[in-house]
Amino acid sequence: MQGRLEDGVVHLPGDARQRFHDSRGYGRPTGGDDLEVAPVEAAHLLSRDDIDGVDGMGLRELLARTGTTLDFVVYKDLRDRGFYLSPAREGWPGVADAADADFLVYPRGKGPWDGEVEHRVRVVGERESIPVSSLGEVVLAIVDEDGDLTYFDTEGDDPEGTAAEDLPADLDAELLSDRALVWDGVDRLYQRGFFGQRLYGRNADSGPLQLSLLEAAYLARADALAIDEADVVSRGRDVEGDRFDRRLAVYAALREAKTVPKSGFKFGSDFRVYTEFESVDDLSHSEFLVRVVAPDHTFVPRDLSLDVRLAGGVRKRMVFALTDDNGEIDWLSVSRLTP
């Protein structure tokens, strides 16, 4: 069987609908027995010797002509894993759900006729840039320079915890160059709120408490410290510029969501976050890492992979807090996916 390429679509004649769509989920019917398939679908049929050519072209020529090599790598991999999938093209099945996607992948055992989508997949090369605002409810299929595939699931994920907050009032605090010190009445802050760190070390049972500027600003706003919030924020801006305001907005939002954020420095992130907390003496592992980014941030796939790999390696989720100048936050969770 020879296909015909016209206006970016390959037309297959004869009994193509019965052979390729009705039984195996390729293309879209056009009436009768004929079938329209996308170039990547035609390339897959060529690779299986299910059709003889497209306008006399074999697989090599078709991929070069249509520029679908990366799409073919992903399409074939998902087919090999047992999925039926459709290209996200106008007029193809499920296209209403296909914004920012290249393929719609159906649950195993289902196809385009069932109306159920398992994954919305976008194909990305290793060196392409990825606007963070374009992510969420889509799976990234990243093809590296060797042709290997890595899948990342991206979805909105508002933080939520069970940590109760019980703050003291008007504790004396001393504002330093990059932190604050609280000398008296610190047990309630530290033991029951996990604010700060003991100046004498994490294993100390007593002594003054050192607070990050983020913690100090948050506590000053809540009148737990007898210092001016504006002074703390000004000091924070001196230390890290406007980024301090974004990080403070995220810190406050995490606390308001009944989670406990702490420094994520050791994990290369802004925060590590505990969703369950009762006391420092009964501390569990943190559940996810947070990196604060601007809404117009652009990822390089290699950096995204590094963040997600590191989080997964320590059994945590990677969450990005897209934070604008007004402190509005959209949350994005990214994790490795094996389809």
Swiss-Prot record:
It comes from Haloferax volcanii (strain ATCC 29605 / DSM 3757 / JCM 8879 / NBRC 14742 / NCIMB 2012 / VKM B-1768 / DS2). Belongs to the tRNA-intron endonuclease family. Archaeal long subfamily. The N-terminus is blocked. Pfam families: tRNA_int_endo (PF01974), tRNA_int_endo_N (PF02778). It is an enzyme of class 4 (lyase). Optimum pH is 6.5-8.5. The keyword ATP-binding does not apply. Divalent cations; Ca(2+) better than Mg(2+). Its EC number is 4.6.1.16. CDD domains: tRNA-intron_lyase_C (cd22363). Homodimer. The active site is at residues 274, 285, 316. One of its GO terms (molecular function) is nucleic acid binding. Keywords: Lyase, tRNA processing. InterPro entries: tRNA_endonuc-like_dom_sf, tRNA_intron_Endo_cat-like_sf, tRNA_intron_Endonuc_cat-like, tRNA_intron_Endonuc_N, tRNA_intron_Endonuc_N_sf, tRNA_splic, tRNA_splic_arch_long. This is tRNA-splicing endonuclease. One of its GO terms (cellular component) is cytoplasm. Its cofactor is Ca(2+); Mg(2+).
